[in-house]
Amino acid sequence: MFQASKTHLDELQLKRLEEMCIVIDKQDQIIGADTKKNCHLMENINKGLLHRAFSVVLFNMKNELLVQQRADAKYTFPGHFTDSCSSHPLYVPEELEEKDALGVRRAALRRLQAELGISQDQISIKDIIFMTRKYHKCQSDAIWGEHEIGYLLLVRKDLMLNPDTREVRRCCYMSQKDVQELLDREARGEEKITPWFRSMVEDFLFSWWPHLEDVSSFVEPDKIYGL
């Protein structure tokens, strides 16, 4: 069944399935490592396998949010609209560092470059604000799913983009009104949105949006929502 479920994956996505994710408990304490494939198989998720992840919400200086549509070759939620960049820190020393979420923020820099072509001479660790954490569990299809504690990271900066079409079908900046209209279209069955993006928008982004010039009052690094 797994073999049949990966026929839409390209060489890049198949290679990434062998990357080592950080396995955690529900307090976000590291307890080991496992492959990205194993972490996203529903048979393992249903046994409790949980890993660390992150989502970046990237705003330009006009306070528009970069929304991407995931490539059709993605193993979970292909073709769905979602946040600016979401992925996983890897089980490597530089991405395991927990002080100030440095490891996760380094992983975000890596994936912003890989997915969106944002070179690291444009953006630094200091540009990435660790806002809070959110637990989520969702099923993509009979084989694949997500079971993560995601670090919510915020960037507000004008950046040059060069998306990798193997990762991103398309992306565009949206106003708060545009995002609400996207959610409304999804509710009518006209669009597909990842479950974590919908909950992120409704639980956090609409509250943060009017305060993007200074989000310090919303920073909750010790909190894990959704548990």
From Swiss-Prot:
GO annotation, cellular component aspect: peroxisome
Enzyme class: isomerase
Binding site for Mg(2+): H40, H51, E146, E148
UniProt EC number: 5.3.3.2
Any Pfam family matching the protein: NUDIX
Active site: S86, E148
Gene Ontology MF terms: isopentenyl-diphosphate delta-isomerase activity; metal ion binding
GO annotation terms (biological process): cholesterol biosynthetic process; dimethylallyl diphosphate biosynthetic process; isopentenyl diphosphate metabolic process; isoprenoid biosynthetic process; negative regulation of cholesterol biosynthetic process
Motif (Microbody targeting signal): 225-227
Binding-site positions, substrate: K36, R70, K74, S87
PROSITE patterns: NUDIX (PS51462)
Cell compartment(s), UniProt: Peroxisome
Cofactor note as given: Binds 1 Mg(2+) ion per subunit.
UniProt keyword list: Cholesterol biosynthesis, Cholesterol metabolism, Isomerase, Isoprene biosynthesis, Lipid biosynthesis, Lipid metabolism, Magnesium, Metal-binding, Peroxisome, Steroid biosynthesis, Steroid metabolism, Sterol biosynthesis, Sterol metabolism
Cofactor: Mg(2+)
NCBIfam families: IPP_isom_1
Protein's name in the database: Isopentenyl-diphosphate delta-isomerase 2
